[in-house]
């Protein structure tokens, strides 16, 4: 039992250095600002951001050094003269820098872990597309999945208490508590409805970091159960004794942490080694080769785990048991499913010929065209029916700037949805963006589309027709010698680290 407790509290006894003094360092805000722009895939050009200029950061740090200017009132933050005067300005810069600071201890642990395991090219594993080869290799063999909507804490104080195990700096925790209570909102941060302002973007990163730290607490229990049970498949005498001892430890673990009274009657709950867990945003997927009864046991276990150990009210109706053969998963902007691919094999023995019908399971990924068109309509690129329109807010920009913005949007969407099994939906999205670009340019020059194209020529839109730039990728289908064959195959890129706002339909 002591061994299990030490595992669940791994590295929590290690005190971290104080992080609060880093808030007063100028280079922290420079790093945070550069990281936000370098990882951005938004349609806007970064340009010059006066809200993050060095002069403003110096003025901000000077005001924080002044006495009684950085006091936090628990009841009303408007009483604070520091935030009351420049709330919409300083409150955007400080959370961005503070989010960069609190990630430092976790980044150091991640680097040391990758170096210890000698993982080569670990940056490729950060790509969102790297998860799809895993689904291709494993999901076609599974039968059922648990589609889970992860519950969130009823109060942000639960999130702060989670980080107390890792951060021993009381000042940083108090400042974190202030930011969470003042600026964060569950609905707008976890499930953003649309691409918000820079204010929401800056505060969202801090909130998501704290939220993911909280979710990791109960995910670590899953990892422990999975890693221990996966090594108990041998039937040798030594491992058999270890297996019996492990099941005994599991009963005590669940009785202490989860309080499942009937766990002894369901020992098969953790004996299934072929299980896979995936989480994205507020959803998670638990796939297995087991039966429907086995998945119902896991459903009851998850509900009890959250309610008893993590004090989270969770309704069983938030967990759906779906059969992969009859259900599609809305996963990271794709509709993923496992469909049967029928084939006929002709076999001949001497003078007798036979036709054998064979069906092979195939992992399929499609682009949901309707939600994507709705996202383009909200961004004012087209109507709700998919008819391209002009972008009035960009009409005052230069022609090259307008074309560059549309080109980057088209390139980002093409890269992100390059793994689609069919390219028809992608062709339609490119058509909408191209015609929207032409209409925007025609609106700027106060001409019709036909007149504008006749005077400008086809060279103006050649940016859209240029081939994609070379980036690392891999495909699932057999390679072709022609570009046409490569374009028809599914391509997964290794340089995509965040979901495009237009592809995020939630």
Curated annotation (Swiss-Prot):
Lineage: Eukaryota, Viridiplantae, Streptophyta, Embryophyta, Tracheophyta
Membrane-spanning parts: none
Gene Ontology CC annotations of this record: chloroplast
Subcellular locations according to the entry: Plastid, Chloroplast
Gene symbol of the encoding locus: matK
GO biological process, one term: tRNA processing
An annotated Gene Ontology molecular function: RNA binding
Organism, as annotated: Avicennia germinans
Family designation: Belongs to the intron maturase 2 family. MatK subfamily.
UniProt protein name: Maturase K
Pfam families according to UniProt: Intron_maturas2, MatK_N
PANTHER family given in the database record: MATURASE K (PTHR34811:SF1)
Keywords: Chloroplast, mRNA processing, Plastid, RNA-binding, tRNA processing
Alphabetical list of InterPro entries matching this protein: Domain_X, Maturase_MatK, Maturase_MatK_N
Protein task: Usually encoded in the trnK tRNA gene intron. Probably assists in splicing its own and other chloroplast group II introns.
């Amino acid at each position: 039992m002591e061994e299990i407790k030490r595992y669940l509290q791994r590295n929590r006894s290690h005190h971290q250095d104080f992080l609060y003094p880093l808030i007063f360092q100028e280079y922290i805000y420079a790093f945070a600002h550069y990281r936000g722009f370098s990882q951005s895939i938004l349609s806007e050009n970064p340009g010059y951001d006066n809200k993050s200029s060095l002069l403003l950061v110096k003025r901000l740090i000077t005001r924080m050094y002044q006495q009684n200017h950085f006091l936090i009132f628990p009841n009303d933050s408007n009483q604070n003269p520091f935030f009351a005067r420049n709330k919409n300005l300083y409150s955007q810069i400080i959370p961005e820098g503070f989010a960069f600071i609190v990630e430092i201890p976790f980044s150091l642990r991640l680097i040391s872990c990758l170096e210890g395991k000698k993982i080569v090219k670990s940056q490729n594993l950060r790509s969102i597309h790297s998860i799809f080869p895993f689904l291709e290799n494993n999901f076609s063999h599974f039968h059922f999945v648990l589609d889970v909507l992860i519950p969130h804490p009823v109060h942000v104080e639960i999130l702060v208490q989670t980080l107390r195990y890792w951060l021993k700096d009381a000042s940083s925790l108090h400042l974190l508590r202030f930011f969470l209570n003042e600026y964060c909102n569950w609905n707008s941060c976890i499930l953003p409805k649309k691409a918000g302002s820079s204010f929401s973007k800056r505060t969202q990163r801090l909130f998501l970091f704290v939220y993911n730290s909280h979710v990791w607490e109960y995910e670590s229990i899953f990892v422990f159960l999975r890693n221990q049970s996966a090594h108990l498949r041998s039937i040798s005498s030594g491992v058999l004794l270890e297996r019996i001892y492990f099941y005994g430890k599991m009963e005590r673990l669940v009785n202490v942490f989860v309080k499942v009274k009937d766990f002894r009657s369901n020992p098969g709950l953790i004996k299934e080694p072929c299980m896979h867990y995936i989480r994205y945003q507020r959803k998670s997927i638990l796939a297995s080769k087991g039966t429907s009864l086995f998945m119902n046991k896991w459903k009851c276990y998850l509900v009890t785990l959250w309610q008893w150990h993590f004090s989270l009210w969770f309704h069983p109706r938030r967990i759906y048991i779906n059969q992969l053969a009859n259900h599609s998963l809305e996963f990271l902007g794709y509709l993923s499913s496992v469909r049967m691919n029928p084939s006929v094999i002709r076999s001949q023995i001497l003078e007798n010929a036979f036709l054998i019908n064979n069906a092979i399971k195939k992992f399929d990924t499609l682009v949901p065209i309707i939600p994507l068109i709705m996202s383009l309509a909200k961004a004012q690129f087209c109507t709700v029916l998919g008819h391209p329109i002009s972008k009035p807010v960009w009409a005052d920009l230069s022609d090259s700037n307008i074309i560059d913005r549309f080109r980057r949007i088209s390139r980002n969407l093409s890269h992100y949805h390059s793994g689609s099994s069919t390219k028809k939906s992608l062709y339609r999205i490119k058509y909408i963006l191209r015609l929207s670009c032409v209409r925007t340019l025609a609106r700027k020059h106060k001409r019709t589309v036909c007149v504008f194209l006749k005077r400008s020529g086809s060279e103006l839109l050649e940016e859209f027709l240029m081939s994609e730039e070379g980036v690392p990728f891999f495909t699932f289908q057999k390679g072709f010698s022609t570009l046409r064959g490569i374009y028809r195959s599914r391509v997964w890129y290794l340089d995509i680290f965040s979901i495009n706002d237009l592809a995020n339909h939630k």
